[in-house]
Amino acid sequence: AKHVAVGDLQFADDAERDVARQFFRGLPYVEVVESASYPPCIGMSGMMILNESGKSIFSSRYCVETEGYPQMMGMALKEGRMARERNEAVVNETFARIMRWGDEILGRVVHNSHTSLGDLKVVGVLKDFHTASFYVPQQPLIVRCGKFGNSIHIRLKEPFVENLSKLNSQASEAFPGKTVDFYPLEQEMQEAYSIVRVFRDATILAAVVMLFVMLMGLIG
């Protein structure tokens, strides 16, 4: 997440997407530009995985990403390649383990609840990494390749803060009809953990209060 800026931008068609991507790539302080439907720290969306009879087996985390996104974010492929076609998918090790595929993973077919997609062919396996936060147990994940847009991730050169300001300024000028607000991915990760910390502290406080009430009852 270091030196990565994130911002949400939607594009009307492929031509607009191509223009936008070339714009970002052409900025002198930009190293890499990719996109995903959600950053990993958000927890991603969900997809219900079905068996051959159409019965739900489990819910998997689900994300749509550009082909180079995993490499940009340091997500390592254990085998195979990133999905490129609409009906292709990459799964993580936990997903394959839940499906009991053993070592024969590539070429497997995933039946899912997204009827508009149809079955997905597994072309790659990602090594496990945490989505949401480290407080959340390892989750199954399935990834498809998607078009540029939604949550845009841009790795900036140093000085990061200065270049982030330039990015927001120049992108706002380039896309006057859109709301441009790039921010550090690390900031979003810190906010996600702060929510967990507040909940944890509130839980501990509630437990202490309950214990105090019980002790008062015993004494009284």
Region annotations inferred by a language model:
Residues 14-32, 93-97, 114-200:
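"Rare, low-scoring activations can occur
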Residues 1-97, 114-118, 191:
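Structured, solvent-exposed hinge/loop segments at the ends of secondary-structure elements
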Residues 59-66, 104, 206-210:
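Short, basic, helix/turn surface patches
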Residues 104-117:
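Short conserved beta-strand and strand-loop elements enriched in small hydrophobics
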Residues 197-220:
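Hydrophobic alpha-helical transmembrane segments of multi-pass inner-membrane transport and secretion
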